[in-house]
Swiss-Prot record:
Gene: KATG2
Record note on quaternary structure: Homodimer; disulfide-linked.
Family matches, as Pfam families: peroxidase
InterPro entries given in the database record: Catalase_peroxidase, Haem_peroxidase, Haem_peroxidase_sf, Peroxidases_AS, Peroxidases_heam-ligand_BS
Protein name listed in UniProt: Catalase-peroxidase 2
Catalytic residues, chain numbering: 141 (proton acceptor)
Cofactor note: Binds 1 heme b (iron(II)-protoporphyrin IX) group per monomer.
Biological process, per Gene Ontology: cellular response to hydrogen peroxide; hydrogen peroxide catabolic process
C-alpha cells in the first residue's frame, strides 16, 4: 500500500466519532437527499446567528442569484456543449490516458485490490471480513446506469464520483467503497483512472471470491465534472417516490412497465434498476418481473443475461437495513463540510458494521456470501417464502421453516434464515425467468458461463469497439454488442489514389455535392460519444436497419450507394492489392463535395482524409440495438421534428453533444450543410441562398437580415416562412433547427460572425475543421496508431 496509508487510516477513523450532520451543511436538505426549497431563504449576515455560513441557496457571489434559466426556463441551454473541455482537465489537455495506462503495473494493482478485500477497516468494517460484495456493488452501480436507447450512463467516465450519482439513494455507502480504494488510486496515480479502477476492483473481487471472469479491458479516461447531458428523469423526488413523470402518473404496476419514459431504464429517480421491494414498494414478485424485464432490456440485456446478472451478482454479499432510516444523515452533496465528501452518517452506535443501513433491506442470499456458488438459485427455488419486514421496516421475504444457517456478517456465533428480495422472487414468478433459473439450478456451469459473459458486457457496454480496450486481460473473443468490425482487406490507398477516387466520384452520374454531403453526414452523425457506438466506420448505413430509416431517404441513399459501389468495384478491380472500402468512399464522397463547394465559392482548401475504414457485414450488426441510433430529428439535415417533451432544437443540441461539438462547431456545421443543400430529402428548407451547392455563409447573412420577416406556417411552430418586409414576397422556408440560430442570443452571436464581411474564408476553414472532426469521431484505430 501507499506510504501515506497509516495517516489515511488515522483520518478515516474519525468517521466513527459522533458528527453533526447539520452544521455548515445544506439547511434545506432532507434525509432522502432532496431539497425543500419552500423553506425561508433568509439572509444571515452576522456570525452569531444560527444560520450564518450555511447554504443560502441563492448566493450573492459568482454564479449565484437568480439566473437566466430561472427567468426563462424554456431558453435553449448550450451548457452540454461546453462540457469536458481539455482546459478543464487537471492532468493537462494533452494528457494521453491510453499511453499512461500502458505503463501501469497491472498485476500489482490487482494484487493490491485482492489484499485490500480482507483488510477490514475500523471506520467501515467489512461484512464477513471481506469487501468483495461491496466492491462488486460499486462496479455494478457504476456500469449499470447505462441505457441502450441513448447510450448515456455507464461506467465509462467515472461519473459515480459526482452528483447526482454520488448521492443517489441506490448508491448509499458506495462513497465508502471509493474511499477504501483511494490508497490504490493514490499509489498508481495517473496510470489508472477512477473509471477503470472502480470496475477493475469489482472484477478482481469476483475473481478473489472464486469466480472466473472473462477478462477486463481498461481505457476509460476520467472526466472532471458531472455529466449534465444525461436525462435521469423529470421527477423532483427520489425513490420511494420519484416515478410519477416517467410513468405519466400511472400507478397500475401490472400494466405500466413498458410505458416507462424513453430513454430511461430505472423505475424511480435515484435507482439503478428497479425497486427491490417491488413496484412502488408493493411486494408483488410477478409485477416486479415486468419491471425487471423492461429495465434490463433497456440497458441491452436479454432474459438470459438478466437472470445471469441477478443470480450471479447475488451469489455474493448482502443488503443492509439494520436500523431505521430516520437515523441516517444527508447524502454527500448535502452533508457537512467536515464529512469531506462522505454522506449518510449513521447515528446508531458506530454507524457501521452491525448497525449499517443502506437500502433498508436486510438480506443475505447464500450461506457462502464471500465464495462463488450456486447457493442463490438453490435457496430461491428450493425454499418457500413468506413476506416479512426488515429491522428498518422494508418488505422482504424469509424462508418458511428455513434452516438457520446463513452467517451473520459480524458475529460468527450467530446465524439467520434464508432471505430474499421481492425482485429475487420475480425470477420464480415469471415463466421465462423460471425456466432459465431451473435449468441453471441443475447446470451451474452454464450459469457461470452466462454470468461471466453478462458481467463482461455490463462492465464494457459503453467502452466502444475493441480497439479501445487496454491491458493484458482483454479476451480474444468478440461479441455482437461490441459492434465488431472485420480486418481490413488489401493494401491501404495512398494520397494519389485518394485524388483519383475523388475525381471518379465527382464525375459519376447521379452524384452531386448535396447528395454526397448528405450521405456522408448521415453516416457519420450516428456516432454517440456516450458509448462510442455509431459513426461511418463499418458502412452500416448500407445495412439494416439504417438503410431503411426515413431520415436516410432510402431511395436516394440506395442510388448514392450503388454509384459509390461502382466506383469501388472499378478501383478494386484495377489496382492490384490496393482496396478501398465503401465506408471510406462514403466519407471521401463527402470530402470531395466539400472541396468542390468551397472552390466554387472561391476558396481553395484541402479537406483532411484518413483512409482505413472497413465494411461490416449484416451478421456483425445487431439490428435491434442499432435501431436505437435512429434520429427522432436531425438538425444537420433538416429532418423530423420535436416531441411533446423535447423541441427540435433541443434534439439538435443533444445530438451535437454526442458529437462532442462546441456551440461554434454546431453553428458552422449547420450553416455549411444548408449552403451545400444537404437536407435529407433534397428540399430547400433552410437553404437561404441562390448559390446552392457552394460553400458560402449565405445562410447566416440572410438569417440575420432585418429585411426578412419570419412567420410560422403552422400551429406547431415547426415550419417558418421568410418574407421580404417591403414586397411581402416569400423568399425562404425554414425550420426550428434553422431559425434558432437567429433567435437564440448565443447562437446568433456566433452566426453574426459568419455573416460579417471578410469572414468567408474563416467560415470555410471552420466548416472543414468541424466536418473533419465529425467524420473521424469513430476512428479509434487512428488514435491507437498515434
Amino acid at each position: 500500500m501507499h506510504a501515506s496509508l497509516s495517516s489515511w487510516l488515522l483520518a478515516a477513523s474519525l468517521l466513527t466519532q459522533p458528527i453533526s450532520v447539520s452544521g455548515q451543511g445544506c439547511p434545506f436538505a432532507k434525509r432522502d437527499g432532496t431539497v425543500d426549497s419552500s423553506l425561508p431563504q433568509k439572509r444571515a449576515d452576522a456570525p452569531e446567528t444560527t444560520t450564518f455560513g450555511r447554504c443560502a441557496v441563492k448566493s450573492n457571489q459568482a454564479g449565484g442569484g437568480t439566473r437566466s434559466h430561472d427567468w426563462w426556463p424554456c431558453q435553449l441551454r448550450l451548457d452540454v456543449l461546453r462540457q469536458f473541455q481539455p482546459s478543464q482537465n487537471p492532468l493537462g489537455g494533452d494528457f494521453d490516458y491510453a499511453e499512461a495506462f500502458q505503463s501501469l503495473d497491472y498485476e500489482a494493482v490487482k494484487k493490491d485490490i485482492a489484499a485490500l478485500m480482507t483488510e477490514s477497516q475500523d471506520w467501515w468494517p467489512a461484512d464477513f471480513g471481506n469487501y468483495g460484495g461491496l466492491f462488486v456493488r460499486m462496479a455494478w452501480h457504476s456500469a449499470g446506469t447505462y441505457r441502450a436507447m441513448d447510450g448515456r450512463g455507464g461506467g465509462g467516465m467515472g461519473q459515480q464520483r459526482f452528483a447526482p450519482l454520488n448521492s443517489w439513494p441506490d448508491n448509499q455507502n458506495l462513497d465508502k467503497a471509493r474511499r477504501l480504494i483511494w490508497p490504490i488510486k493514490q499509489k498508481y496515480g495517473n496510470k489508472i483512472s477512477w473509471a477503470d479502477l472502480m470496475l477493475l476492483t469489482g472484477n478482481v473481487a469476483l475473481e478473489n471470491m472464486g469466480f472466473k471472469t472473462l477478462g477486463f479491458g481498461g481505457g476509460r479516461a476520467d472526466t472532471w465534472q458531472s455529466d449534465e447531458a444525461v436525462y435521469w428523469g423529470a421527477e423532483t423526488t427520489f425513490v420511494p417516490q420519484g416515478n410519477d413523470v416517467r410513468y405519466n402518473n400511472s400507478v397500475d404496476i401490472n400494466a405500466r412497465a413498458d410505458k416507462l419514459e424513453k430513454p430511461l431504464a430505472a423505475t424511480h429517480m435515484g435507482l439503478i434498476y428497479v425497486n427491490p421491494e417491488g413496484p412502488n414498494g408493493t411486494p408483488d414478485p410477478a409485477a416486479s418481473a415486468k419491471d425487471i424485464r423492461e429495465a434490463f432490456g433497456r440497458m441491452g440485456m436479454n432474459d438470459t443475461e438478466t437472470v445471469a446478472l441477478i443470480a450471479g451478482g447475488h451469489a455474493f454479499g448482502k443488503t443492509h437495513g439494520a436500523v431505521k432510516g430516520s437515523n441516517i444523515g444527508p447524502a454527500p452533496e448535502a452533508a457537512d463540510l467536515g464529512m469531506q465528501g462522505l454522506g449518510w452518517h449513521n447515528s446508531v452506535g458506530d454507524g457501521n458494521g452491525p448497525n449499517q443501513m443502506t437500502s433498508g433491506l436486510e438480506v443475505i442470499w447464500t450461506k457462502t456470501p464471500t465464495k462463488w456458488s450456486n447457493g442463490y438459485l438453490e435457496s430461491l427455488i428450493n425454499n418457500n417464502w413468506t413476506l416479512v419486514e426488515s429491522p428498518a421496516g422494508a418488505h422482504q421475504w424469509e424462508a418458511v421453516n428455513g434452516t438457520v444457517d446463513y452467517p451473520d456478517p459480524f458475529d460468527k456465533t450467530k446465524f439467520r434464515k434464508a432471505t430474499m428480495l421481492t425482485s429475487d422472487l420475480a425470477l420464480i414468478n415469471d415463466p421465462e425467468y423460471l425456466k432459465i433459473s431451473q435449468r441453471w439450478l441443475e447446470h451451474p456451469e452454464e450459469l457461470a458461463d452466462a454470468f461471466a459473459k453478462a458481467w463482461f458486457k455490463l462492465l464494457h457496454r459503453d467502452l466502444g469497439p475493441t480497439t479501445r480496450y487496454l491491458g493484458p486481460e482483454v479476451p480474444k473473443e468478440s461479441f455482437i454488442w461490441q459492434d465488431p468490425l472485420p480486418a481490413r482487406e488489401g493494401d491501404l490507398i495512398d494520397d494519389a489514389d485518394v485524388d483519383k477516387l475523388k475525381a471518379a466520384i465527382l464525375s459519376t452520374d447521379g452524384l452531386d455535392v448535396s447528395k454526397l454531403a448528405s450521405t456522408a453526414m448521415a453516416c457519420a452523425t450516428t456516432y454517440r460519444n456516450s458509448d462510442k457506438r455509431g459513426g461511418c466506420n463499418g458502412a452500416r448505413i448500407a445495412l439494416e436497419p439504417q438503410r431503411n430509416w426515413v431520415s436516410n431517404n432510402p431511395t436516394q441513399l440506395s442510388a448514392v450507394l450503388d454509384a459509390l459501389k461502382k466506383v469501388q468495384s472499378d478501383f478494386n478491380g484495377s489496382n492490384g492489392n490496393k482496396k478501398v472500402s465503401l465506408a471510406d468512399l462514403i466519407v471521401l464522397g463527402g470530402t470531395a463535395a466539400v472541396e468542390k463547394a468551397a472552390k466554387d465559392a472561391g476558396v481553395d482548401i484541402k479537406v483532411p482524409f484518413s483512409a482505413g475504414r472497413v465494411d461490416a457485414t449484416q451478421e456483425q450488426t445487431d439490428v435491434t440495438q442499432f435501431s436505437y441510433l435512429e434520429p427522432q430529428a436531425d438538425g444537420f439535415r433538416n429532418y423530423g421534428r420535436g416531441t411533446a417533451r423535447a423541441r427540435t432544437e433541443e434534439i439538435m443540441v443533444d445530438k451535437a453533444s454526442q458529437l462532442t461539438l462546441t456551440p461554434p462547431e454546431l453553428t458552422v456545421l449547420v450553416g455549411g450543410m444548408r449552403a451545400l443543400g444537404a437536407n435529407y430529402d433534397g428540399s430547400d428548407v433552410g437553404v437561404f441562398t441562390a448559390n446552392k451547392g457552394k460553400l458560402t455563409p449565405d445562410f447566416f447573412v440572410n438569417l440575420v437580415d432585418m429585411n426578412i420577416a419570419w412567420t410560422a406556417s403552422g400551429a406547431d411552430g415547426e415550419s417558418w416562412v421568410g418574407t421580404d418586409r417591403k414586397s411581402r414576397s416569400e423568399k425562404y422556408k425554414g425550420s426550428r433547427a434553422d431559425l434558432v440560430f437567429g433567435s437564440h442570443a448565443e447562437l446568433r452571436a456566433i452566426a453574426e460572425v459568419y455573416a460579417e464581411n471578410g469572414n468567408q474564408e474563416k467560415f470555410v476553414k471552420d466548416f472543414v475543421a468541424a466536418w473533419t472532426k465529425v467524420m473521424n469521431l469513430d476512428r479509434f484505430d487512428l488514435k491507437v496508431k498515434k
